[in-house]
UniProtKB/Swiss-Prot annotation:
<dbReference type="GO" id="GO:0005886">
    <property type="term" value="C:plasma membrane"/>
</dbReference>
<keyword id="KW-0808">Transferase</keyword>
<dbReference type="InterPro" id="IPR003673">
    <property type="entry name" value="CoA-Trfase_fam_III"/>
</dbReference>
<comment type="similarity">
    <text>Belongs to the CoA-transferase III family.</text>
</comment>
<dbReference type="InterPro" id="IPR050509">
    <property type="entry name" value="CoA-transferase_III"/>
</dbReference>
<feature type="active site" description="Nucleophile">
    <location>
        <position position="558"/>
    </location>
</feature>
<comment type="function">
    <text>Probable CoA-transferase.</text>
</comment>
<dbReference type="GO" id="GO:0016740">
    <property type="term" value="F:transferase activity"/>
</dbReference>
<dbReference type="InterPro" id="IPR044855">
    <property type="entry name" value="CoA-Trfase_III_dom3_sf"/>
</dbReference>
<protein>
    <recommendedName>
        <fullName>Probable CoA-transferase Rv1866</fullName>
        <ecNumber>2.8.3.-</ecNumber>
    </recommendedName>
</protein>
<dbReference type="GO" id="GO:0009274">
    <property type="term" value="C:peptidoglycan-based cell wall"/>
</dbReference>
<dbReference type="Pfam" id="PF02515">
    <property type="entry name" value="CoA_transf_3"/>
</dbReference>
<dbReference type="InterPro" id="IPR023606">
    <property type="entry name" value="CoA-Trfase_III_dom_1_sf"/>
</dbReference>
């Protein structure tokens, strides 16, 4: 794999190739004389960019001079013999060596060429620049973050770039798998904006806030109604978060509170009744927490079965007992002469970590050649233009968002996905509003699936599942650790049914370690990994009665966890096809979070231990009020030059040399005054007008979009990101994504409607297992299986 990222253009491109390097790819980074400019991007540790050091581990580096004819020939020779080329920016780094990324794909038929830009290579906003905060604004994530009124709160910097990188890695590995199938590579015009819209907090995917986009008959443009759905309380040494959902969890909390007489009525077993009375219950919980430490509260809550976790600070995460025990953190010489704790990576394969092995190389450390000849591959068996996963069969035991997204990604690309469901414990995404037969979330997440109703606790049900495993390629599950084994389907058992099977799983804190048995709700994962603590803003401070955190309405990291799982599962299937052996792969949601924000965690840990000098990022990203009712835009000032250009747009060039704002450190120190000065300009313009004027001057800015705005975004329309999906049980068409990225040789996702529970049970058992009508009828009558009425 040829990595042409400069570490600056299209932020996060280095992460794409790091992901594939972790999985064993030979990644050769091509740098110009003097090295990539990304080596100096802040924050820096002992003079080296932390982000560059983290995202270029496990790679090699060769220096080629684009002005030297012999080096230009060497570059083309490398591209000709590569499997994948990853480039970034417009026109891209490859163009300096004589051929753009698209031209390389034209020239070398086998090559998969990925071009990553902020907004895509063409379209009305292709020249726009993006930062993470700009992507939060334009993707709709910002509109769901912050108080009900007042300034919206930016999510932590880094999540958007890391999410886009995972989506890009998935897209390029899909194209590579397709090359193995049909013999032809591809060119992918990848937009980070597209990726963040689809994979961070998608407005048109499994998400509780989707009502803003499709349920209302009007154009609802409100803000979050409840930022305390998962309440946080101060305690003696910090904060704790509760996530009380099930009746048994409420009863545990009630015991902890001393069985208060006012709340003994069984009606409080229902969430709605508790929410109505929560102001009164909250007084008791606050009193309980006030005099105890985080550790004491978490231990007591766990003993009573109450979902609770500490709201930890980033500086404490890398040293936590859990991450240390499972090897998610390793002590490494991240930069020359400096050792510090670093996240190992996302992936666990057959119980072993596939992650950080070697530090980022020095520029030109290696020769411009590949380590080995390409691995032999069998002759192509598929046709160009087909779906890459045609012929793959997936048994999907996944639930809610992370599990559903994993299987959807395969179904959208042609796999036969069989969703195996229990009559007694249906998938939470099947919950609907009164009178509805199908939820929008289920329709989006389980399109292109078949539905099998099967009791896996019944001996006959187990036998049927085992027979299906023998006929399948992969099993996907995201149960609490130990659940699949308790059902009788450990990986060893599945492997005995089918030695080629891939088991891909995910859980909140992984399947081993001190926290592995903790309850795995997303809000608890965010709190335990430091995300909640940094999801805050000086511009949106609450009154003294409320904590300052605003992550309650995000669904991060569920959607990106599904994509990380898909990437790992596909890598395991590629390895299976080469070696004949299956694999057990697993993803920890908490470790996904830590690796998404690795630069922040490493900087905070290094600062806490004072291992070397750290220079922070001095960019100023802020949310500004615009003309209209609750309208906002985001502006990013990353350099003195950008500030000068911005002041010209504001019509106040004298601010460029104002001692409060003229230098980066001064802008950080005088942030509130800068925000006030810029707000005077933005408040007289619409968000699109303000962003457009700044983008024309080369300054990253973007309007805060709501879901309805996203459907009208001219760049997304130009790129055909969505098309209407019709489900016979839903009154109106739903906007649905068309695929992970625009490919040349892979068609858009099909749109077969999501099934009702057990809808395809009979068909599956007859077609795959050769059962007769009498057999399937008996199994349904005996409640081993459920489904529609049997017909001969």
């Amino acid at each position: 794999m040829l990595d042409l990222s400069d570490g600056c253009s299209a932020g996060g491109t280095d992460m794409v190739t790091r992901l594939l390097a972790d999985l064993g790819a030979d990644v050769l980074k091509v740098e110009p004389p003097g090295g990539s400019p990304g080596r100096h991007v802040r924050p820096t540790l002992a003079g080296t960019s932390i982000g560059f050091a983290m995202h270029n581990a496990n790679k090699r580096s060769a220096v080629l001079n684009p002005l030297d004819e012999s080096d230009r020939r060497r570059f083309l020779d490398l591209a000709a013999s590569a499997d994948i080329v990853v480039d970034c920016g417009l026109p891209g780094q490859a163009a300096a060596y004589g051929a753009s990324c698209a031209e390389l794909a034209d020239r070398y038929r086998h090559l998969v060429a990925l071009s990553i830009t902020d907004f895509g290579a063409a379209g009305p906003r292709s020249s726009w620049r993006a930062t993470d905060p700009v992507l939060y604004a334009m993707s709709g994530a910002l509109s769901r973050s912050g108080p009900t009124a007042g300034t919206p709160v930016l999510p932590p910097d880094g999540i958007a770039s890391a999410t886009a990188a995972v989506q890009a890695a998935w897209a390029v590995l899909v194209a590579y798998f397709n090359r193995l199938r049909c013999g032809t590579g591809d060119y992918i015009d990848f937009s980070r904006f597209d990726a963040v819209v689809m994979a961070l907090d998608p407005p048109f995917g499994a998400h509780g806030q989707v009502a803003a986009g499709i349920r209302s008959t009007g154009r609802w443009r409100g803000r979050p109604k409840n930022q305390d759905a998962y309440p946080i309380y101060p305690c003696r040494d910090g904060y704790v978060r509760f996530c009380v959902m099930a009746p048994r969890q409420w009863r545990g909390l009630r015991r902890w509170l001393g069985e208060p007489e006012d709340f003994q009525d069984p009606k409080y077993d229902v969430i709605g009744a508790r929410l109505a009375a929560w102001p009164q219950i909250s007084v008791l919980v606050a009193k309980l927490c006030a005099e105890k430490t985080m550790k004491e509260l978490v231990a007591a809550g766990q003993a009573l079965g109450v979902p609770i976790t500490a709201v930890l600070t980033p500086s404490r995460i890398l040293a936590s007992e859990h991450f240390q025990a499972v090897g998610a953190i390793t002590d490494a010489e991240l930069v020359p002469g400096v050792r510090t704790g670093v996240p190992t990576g996302y992936f666990v394969v057959d119980g072993k970590r596939a992650g950080f092995r070697t530090p980022a190389p020095a520029a030109g450390q290696d020769e411009p050649r590949w380590l080995a000849d390409p691995a032999p591959v069998p002759p192509p068996s598929g046709r160009v233009g087909g779906y890459p996963f045609e012929g793959l069969r997936i048994l999907d035991l996944g639930i809610i968002v992370a599990g559903g997204e994993l299987s959807r990604l395969f179904g959208d690309l042609g796999a036969e996905v069989i969703k195996v469901e229990s009559a007694d414990h249906p998938d939470g995404l099947r919950q609907t509003r009164v009178g509805d037969a199908m939820s929008e979330s289920f329709a989006w997440t389980h399109r292109n699936h078949l539905a099998l109703g099967l009791d896996l606790r019944n001996s006959e049900g187990k036998a049927i599942f085992g027979r299906l495993v023998a006929e399948s390629d992969a099993v996907f599950a995201n149960f609490k650790p130990g659940t699949l084994t308790s059902l009788g389907f450990s990986y060893d058992v599945l492997h005995a049914f089918n030695p080629r099977i891939v088991l891909a799983g995910s859980s909140a804190f992984g399947n081993r370690g001190p926290w592995s048995t903790r309850m795995g709700y997303g809000p608890l994962v965010r709190a335990a990994t430091g995300v909640t603590r940094v999801w805050t803003s000086d511009e949106a401070q609450p009154d003294n009665s409320r904590h300052p955190f605003y992550d309650a309405t995000t669904i991060f990291p569920d959607h990106v966890v599904g994509r990380v799982g898909a990437l790992l599962a596909l890598a395991a299937l590629i390895h299976r096809d080469r070696t004949g052996g299956g694999a057990h792969v697993h993803i920890s949601q908490a470790e996904v979070v830590v690796n998404q924000l690795d630069t922040m965690f490493v900087a905070e840990a290094a600062r806490a231990t004072d291992v070397a000098e750290i220079h922070p990022d001095t960019s100023v990203h802020a949310v500004y009020p615009c003309a209209g009712d609750d309208e906002w835009c985001v502006i990013s000032i990353r350099s003195d030059d950008e500030w000068r250009r911005a002041t010209s747009v504001f019509g106040q060039p004298e601010l460029a040399n104002d001692p409060r704002f003229g230098a980066s450190r001064s802008r950080v120190a005088n942030r509130s005054e800068l925000v006030a000065a810029v707000s005077a300009w933005t408040s007289t313009r619409t968000p699109v007008q303000a962003a457009g004027a700044l983008q024309a001057a080369g300054v990253a800015a973007g309007p805060m979009n709501r879901p309805s705005d996203i459907l009208e975004d001219p760049q997304l329309i130009e790129r055909n990101l969505f098309r209407d999906m019709v489900h016979p049980l839903i009154a109106r068409p739903l906007p649905a994504e068309t695929g992970p990225a625009p490919f040349r040789h892979i068609p858009q996702a099909p749109q077969r409607p999501a099934p009702l529970p057990g809808q395809d049970s009979v068909q599956i058992c007859r077609k795959l297992l050769g059962m007769t009508a009498d057999e399937t009828e008996r199994l349904i009558n005996e409640r081993v299986m459920f489904g529609p009425a049997v017909t001969a």
